[in-house]
Amino acid sequence: MSLTLFSFLSLVSILCIVTAAPVTNVNFTSIQVSSMQHIAAINKASFFSPTALPANATENGLTGSCKPIILIFAKGTGENGNVGDGSSPGPAWFSELRNAIGEDKIAVQGVQYEADVFGYLVGGDPEGSQNYLTITNQAVTQCPNSKIVIGGYSQGAQITHNAAQLYSPLVTSRIAAVVLFGDPYTDKPVGQVSPSSVLEICHDGDIICTGSGGPDPHLTYSKNATCAAKFVLDRI
């Protein structure tokens, strides 16, 4: 992302920039750990809310026919389904893309994993990381003409990093765009994917991706759905 694009997005009042120093190591502070426990509890509680939409928490687009765009997404800690409910920006992001290009043009596939706090502490759930890798490889093999978009929120961003580190050159070449929300590893590359194809959305004061602040800014990434969709549309 260039400063020019950052400036443009600011003009349309869409927050998409890192406004505080990123985490520079993978050792989490006690405040980060307690914040993630708080976030996980809120996300789990949202499942029982009368306003929750559990049906939106699961996407299995790879079970259908190939579509021009395949989006693979991993939920955050404490969330349900395979793309998340609660504070997940995933469903809002998918909706923006479907509205822009048509539901028949995009298949969304979630990554199933435990998404507990322990997974966050070990750098991203190992089984989830493997599932992410397997799903990406499947998408590339199953749909050779599709463009692949990958993303994740919170711990889902961690397992996106973990999977991408193991992508083959062929798989990496098929990645059209990456969008990560509240990424604990926001300063680290996404495998060998070109930085120009990666959008890191990290809110000021989000302790999970900046190392300072608190948990509340980590719960508001759904408001960045329009920005995330625009980034992808500019690259497909």
From Swiss-Prot:
Its main location: secreted. Keywords: Disulfide bond, Hydrolase, Secreted, Serine esterase, Signal, Virulence. Its EC number is 3.1.1.74. Residues 1-20 form the signal peptide. GO terms for cellular component: extracellular region. Transmembrane segments: none annotated. PANTHER family: CUTINASE, CUTINASE 2-RELATED. The keyword NADP does not apply. Catalyzes the hydrolysis of complex carboxylic polyesters found in the cell wall of plants. Degrades cutin, a macromolecule that forms the structure of the plant cuticle. Allows pathogenic fungi to penetrate through the cuticular barrier into the host plant during the initial stage of fungal infection. Belongs to the cutinase family. This is Cutinase.
